[in-house]
Amino acid sequence: MNTNHIRTVKGGGSLQGILNVPGDKSISHRSLIIGSIAEGETNIKGFLYSDDPLSTADCLRKLGVNIPEIKKNQPFTIKGLGIDDFKEPEEILDCGNSGTTMRLLMGLLAGQEGRNFILTGDKSLNERPMGRVSKPLSLMGGIIHGRKNGTKAPISITGNKLKGCVIGTPVASAQVKSAILLAGLNASGTTSVIEPASSRDHTERMLKAFGADINIRGELGRNIVIKSGTNLTGQNILIPGDISSAAFWMIAASIVPESEIIIKNVGLNPTRTGILNVMNEMGCNYEILDKSTIAGEPIGSINIKYVSNLKPFKVEGDILPKLIDEIPILAVAACFCSGVSEIKDAKELRVKETDRLKVMATQLKKFGANILEKEDGLIINGESKFHSAEVDSETDHRVSMSLAIASLLAKGSSKIARAEASRVSYPTFWDDLEKLIN
C-alpha cells in the first residue's frame, strides 16, 4: 500500500453539525475565465481555493490577465482584458489536473488571431479525451494540434479567425459546450450548440449576467445560441457552496445511523440537482431551507437526517449529466440500500480523473461490497456489512472522499492511501469530517 498521505478512518458513531462547503468549482472556474474577457472589474467572493481553479488563475495570468494572489476565504478583483486581447504567453500553459481549465481555454484561445499557445497538464489530464473539443473548434476554423491526431494533450493552438456555425455535441458535456460558446464570442456571426441532453448551464447563466447575446431554445434548453459582437461587462459574483461537495455529507447523513447535518448556502442550479432526485427515490429525509437567488444561481441550505431501510435506485439516461460527479458517492449509498441499485449510461466516468467505474468497484469490494462492473455502469447489491479495509483513492479527489464516507460504515479502522487527492475540489474535507464525527 502506498504509504504517502494515508488517512485512517474509524467506523461507528454518527455525524452531527452545521457546515459550509467550499465554493462551487464549476462557477469558480467560470468567474475567472469570463471575468478575464469582460471589460472593467469583476469582484469575486466565495471562490474555491483549491488546485483546479488555481490552475485556471495561473494560466490566465500567463495570458496577461491582472489576477491578484488569491487567498483562502478572501474576496478579490480581476481586471478584464476584453474578448480579444490575450497576449501570447512566454511559457507553456500548465492546466495541472483540471480538464475544465484545458477545455475552456481551448475554446477561449482558438479565436485569438495571430497568437500561439501550448496547453499541457499532469499525467492524468494528458490522457483524457480532448478531441471532443478540438474537433468542433476545428469546424469553426480553429487550428489545433496535439498527440494522437489532436485528441490528447499537450495541445498546440494557433489563434485564427473563427466562423460561427451549428454544432451538435456527441455527449452532453458542459465543458465541451462551454468551449464552443466561448469560441463563439470571437467567431463571426452566430454559433449554435445542440446537445443530446441538458448539461450544467453555469456558463450560459454567467455569460448572460455579463451581457452576452445568448439565448436558449428547444426542448429542455438543448439548443444554445450565442452571437458575437457584444462586449461583456465586469460583475460582482458571489459563488455558492458546491453541491457536488455537499453530496458527500448529504449521503453520509442519510446512511450513517443517528446522523443529522445542515449544509448552508448550497448552489441548487437545476442542472446540478440530480442527486436530490435520486435521494427522493431512495426515500432520504431532507429539507431545503432559506431559498434565494444570487446572480441567476438558486441557492439554499439543506438539512439531512438519517433514514433506515433506504430503497434501491436506478440512475440512467438524461439525469446523468445532472449528477455525473456524484456517481462515486451514490455507489457508496447503494451498498446500504435494501435491494439492487443500478447505474447505467455512465461510460463518461471511464475518462474522468480515473476510470471511476473501475476504481469504485475495485475499492468498495475491499470493504465487502457486492458490485458487478458493467461497460457503462455498476450493479450494486445493497444491505452490505462492511469490514475495515486498506483502500486507495488512485489520486482521484471524488474517490478519496467517497471512500472516507464508506469507511464510516465499516467495522474497525480503515486506511485510505493518497487521501490528499481531496484537495483538488475540497481542501478542508478532512477537517470538516473531524468536526462532524460525534
From Swiss-Prot:
Active site located where? Answer: D325
- Catalysed reaction(s)? 3-phosphoshikimate + phosphoenolpyruvate = 5-O-(1-carboxyvinyl)-3-phosphoshikimate + phosphate
Q: What is this protein called?
A: 3-phosphoshikimate 1-carboxyvinyltransferase
Keywords associated with the record: Amino-acid biosynthesis, Aromatic amino acid biosynthesis, Cytoplasm, Transferase
Q: Where does phosphoenolpyruvate bind?
A: K25, G99, R128, Q175, R356, R398
The answer to whether the entry has keyword Cytoplasm is yes
Residues binding 3-phosphoshikimate, per UniProt: K25, S26, R30, S173, Q175, D325, K352
| EC class name | transferase
Protein encoded by which gene: aroA
The UniProt entry lists the main location of this chain as: cytoplasm
